[in-house]
């Protein structure tokens, strides 16, 4: 399509500009190459060298230090992905748009897409051939309506786009929570219990995106979590389980691309959520999967009908891919555990595993319940014996021992476990009983205080729903490291502390986010 | 929402990076401000100073020359729009997303939007508060379905978002072609005829975006077209008409924003087209509007049914806004006139106005027909007398004289009128009759040769549909200035010259684009 013009050869320069996910390149307004594209203002271009092709969005510069007349500046992700040294001559032409964009436009017009079309879209997404705008076009085009077949095709294509793990065991279990509840670090209790029993549970987790901590952030307080595929296999082989960051093993990279656009647009459809979660779990090679859907007024799912529709979608996709999927709804009215933020949550987890008398009972009970479900997948275990077995492994210290083994296998953490040196307490305005806790508000407050960037920032809860409080008694304590974060969190908490006591206070509202 | 942190004050730096329409800012990865946003990778931020607010997309840099630790680098559009000197301290916080985005999400979920919601969206668009992704979300959310009321609200809001011209005359006429046909510079013949008659016709035109020339590009060969509002009024007052670039008078700026995203996504819906054209015409203050819809196998509209649906939409919107709208379909099977490219088209126009014996008859006839329709809007003119009056004004030289007056009023052109010094001819492969011409292919060929950047690049046609040709006789000549463009155009023409002769050649296909 585009025979090379002699002057479309440009020298690679590196531009230290982090453009997130999108490939962005810069050429000089004086450049002899791509005159029409410079004139038009916006365009996509194509870099080619030895069969390697990179599609990128073109920006124009008048600054020679970004790109001189004979140069093309590659921003960080483009430079990393094209992987050629500075100064290399590269052919630059107007981009031939990925063919799969035709299917995206058909979807926008309302047509149902074939498996092959969806496969092509996902393949192009996973290879960073779409601009952010084009990703948005696909997401929004499929946000209003996708068929069951499209959902299956999407999930399958996403699962195949990256690393696909294969395990030698007939039963490989996994658990996943759809998120939204502060604390709630059940995986870090469940994995050692299940692994101590002997079932393989190769757990990958995410880092916090909009919450004050993801499981990977919290585990990082105790051990290294940036673990690659081969190392992961070795750890699971020796310990039956792991607790690592999923981003390092490249499961479902197309999902990461989609999320990078869903998030800024606050798009959140059931189908995308199911395709996202199931594609990662299928790629991770688990055969039996437990999905936890917390339900509560400030949780992601606020009612039983919504939870059931989501459950059926998970079951449908699981069945079609030959995975055993069990979906349970749990109490999502308030945080699980007493800590919010990586260090505080890690403390909760170790207290539960260590059978400390002050360990949060809700985290212990929920973890035992989830572990019980997973243990029942062991054909050798007598039906109904899962809970007793889980409790036995926890109470005996076997789970704690297994956790130490996993921590040793993953390697030492490099994070400080210190709590923020600045703190303030939020106190009850009057006597009464705690009647509601706003999960969204506490999440936001913990982030404002510095979590998860500051591992030791966050919130320690003293009271939960149903607890009696007296006027002036602390409801929770906020930890921060720097005065500005401390002050910002204090003023945010003063504007609304997220607790309703006895009906004297208004119920926290979902719109408070 | 975001009380200022002391360290969220950053010094403005100018980053000479042209990011097109979108506001983009850069901060250092070492910056103490916006730590959470740096960590998340993608976010929107807000710059505030003395009540002025700018929303922008945040990029991160490791290069101190783009932004040091205490600086924020503003890319070109952001720097221009914020309009504060380098070094100014500005408060930078995470952005509060525009409230109207909630309506965009509702639209994506399938809800119909109110007039107020659409008004808020358009207002935010026109003030550059949306990211490119957010604009795409709105466009695609409304691409699948918008109601008549939504279309009216959209058109009205867009018309009100920028300059709104008001004329003292009871009848102000205008014409608009939906485009797609090479050559076809009827406005430059129609405006002088109508103006010579005495009807006001304040014509604004676009520059080429994806075509080899817009009316503004072609007029620029003859006169200055970057004319502001006040000057435009003076010109229309003295000459009854003008032929200027619409981009300089800021009619419907929201439309320009939408087009900047529609174009790279190749989104093209009837409703958006109607809202786009009608909003500009309503803002331009015309009372009587003639819309030209060329129909042909390689035109934008390929059949009568499609043309009729579009016509009804134009009529509907025109009626509701109290404008007289007349829609005519014209022959869109081939280029109008013999030239493609600014200089070649300007030559055609001046030949028609000058009544040269070699002037292209099709351009003359189509222009007379359109002018006739417009002249009939003059209440003083006898019904049915429009065509004769138009011909009289053209044949007598009155139209040419009026054109000279308009050119003098707008001021001299600074462009060269020379044709490209390199050229090649495309010749008939055998004897026969020209049976089809591919408009898309010729448009692309003229662009490849350098138009509209090189005003004198383009194509001169020797044969049109129905003409007899002999083997080896030239069909057209391609002009370019530089060898690379010449060679590229030659190889493109060799791969398919866009002409079908006698049925010996395959009919050009629409997919050839």
From Swiss-Prot, chains A, B:
> Which EC main class describes this enzyme?
transferase
Q: Which family does it belong to?
A: Belongs to the thymidine/pyrimidine-nucleoside phosphorylase family. Type 2 subfamily.
- From the UniProt record, list the reaction(s) this protein catalyses: thymidine + phosphate = 2-deoxy-alpha-D-ribose 1-phosphate + thymine
What InterPro entries would the database entry show?
Glycosyl_Trfase_fam3 (IPR000312), Glycosyl_Trfase_fam3_N_dom (IPR017459), Glycosyl_Trfase_fam3_N_dom_sf (IPR036320), Nuc_phospho_transferase (IPR035902), PYNP-like_C_sf (IPR036566), PYNP_C (IPR013102), Pyrmidine_PPase_CS (IPR017872), Thym_Pase_Put (IPR028579)
Name the species this protein comes from: Bradyrhizobium diazoefficiens (strain JCM 10833 / BCRC 13528 / IAM 13628 / NBRC 14792 / USDA 110)
Q: What is its EC number?
A: 2.4.2.4
A Gene Ontology biological process term:
pyrimidine nucleobase metabolic process
- Give the source's domain of life in one word: Bacteria
* One Gene Ontology cellular component annotation held by this UniProt entry: cytosol
Coiled-coil zones: none
Q: Which UniProt keywords apply?
A: Glycosyltransferase, Transferase
According to UniProt, the name of this protein is Putative thymidine phosphorylase
């Amino acid at each position: 399509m585009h025979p090379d013009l002699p002057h479309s050869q440009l020298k690679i320069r590196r531009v230290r500009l982090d453009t997130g996910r999108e490939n962005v390149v810069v050429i000089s307004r004086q450049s002899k190459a791509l005159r029409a594209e410079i004139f038009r203002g916006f365009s996509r271009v194509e870099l080619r060298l030895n069969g390697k092709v990179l599609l990128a969005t073109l920006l124009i510069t008048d600054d020679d230090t970004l790109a001189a007349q004979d140069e093309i500046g590659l921003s960080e992700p483009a430079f990393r992905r094209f992987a050629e040294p500075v100064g290399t001559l590269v052919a630059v032409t107007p981009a031939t748009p990925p063919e799969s964009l035709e299917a995206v436009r058909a979807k926008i017009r309302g047509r149902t897409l074939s498996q092959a079309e969806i496969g092509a879209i996902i393949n192009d997404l996973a290879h960073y051939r779409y601009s952010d705008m084009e990703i948005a076009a696909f997401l929004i085009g499929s946000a209003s309506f996708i068929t069951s077949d499209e959902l299956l095709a999407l999930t399958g294509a996403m699962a195949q786009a990256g690393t696909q793990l294969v395990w030698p065991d007939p039963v490989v279990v996994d658990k996943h929570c759809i998120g939204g509840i502060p604390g709630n670090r059940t995986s870090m209790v469940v994995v050692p219990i299940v692994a101590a029993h002997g079932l393989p549970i190769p757990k990958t987790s995410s880092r916090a995106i909009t919450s004050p901590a993801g499981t990977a952030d919290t585990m990082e307080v105790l051990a290294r979590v940036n673990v690659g595929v081969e190392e992961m296999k070795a750890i699971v082989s020796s310990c039956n389980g792991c607790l690592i960051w999923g981003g390092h093993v490249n499961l479902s990279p197309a999902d990461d691309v989609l999320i990078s656009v869903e998030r800024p647009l606050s798009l959140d459809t059931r189908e995308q959520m199911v395709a996202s979660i199931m594609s990662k779990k299928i790629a991770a090679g688990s055969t039996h999967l437990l999905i936890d859907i917390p339900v509560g007024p400030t949780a992601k799912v606020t009612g039983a009908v919504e939870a059931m529709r989501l459950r059926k979608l998970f079951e449908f996709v699981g069945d079609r891919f030959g995975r055993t999927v069990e979906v349970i709804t749990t109490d999502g009215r308030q945080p699980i555990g007493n800590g919010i933020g990586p260090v505080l949550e890690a403390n909760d987890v170790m207290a539960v595993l260590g059978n400390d008398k002050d360990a949060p009972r809700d985290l212990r009970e929920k973890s035992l319940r989830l572990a019980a479900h997973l243990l029942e997948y062991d054909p050798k275990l007598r039906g109904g014996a899962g809970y007793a077995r889980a409790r036995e492994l926890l109470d005996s210290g076997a789970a704690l021992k297994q956790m130490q083994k996993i921590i040793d296998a993953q390697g030492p953490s490099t994070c400080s476990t210190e709590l923020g040196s600045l703190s303030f307490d939020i106190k009850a305005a009057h006597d009464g009983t705690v009647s509601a806790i706003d999960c969204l508000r506490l999440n936001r407050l913990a982030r404002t205080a510095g979590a998860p960037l500051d591992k030791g920032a966050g919130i320690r809860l003293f009271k939960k729903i149903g607890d009696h409080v007296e006027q002036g008694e602390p409801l929770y304590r906020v930890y921060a490291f720097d005065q500005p974060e401390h002050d910002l969190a204090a003023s945010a908490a003063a504007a609304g502390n997220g607790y309703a006591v006895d009906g004297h206070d208004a119920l926290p509202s979902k719109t408070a986010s």
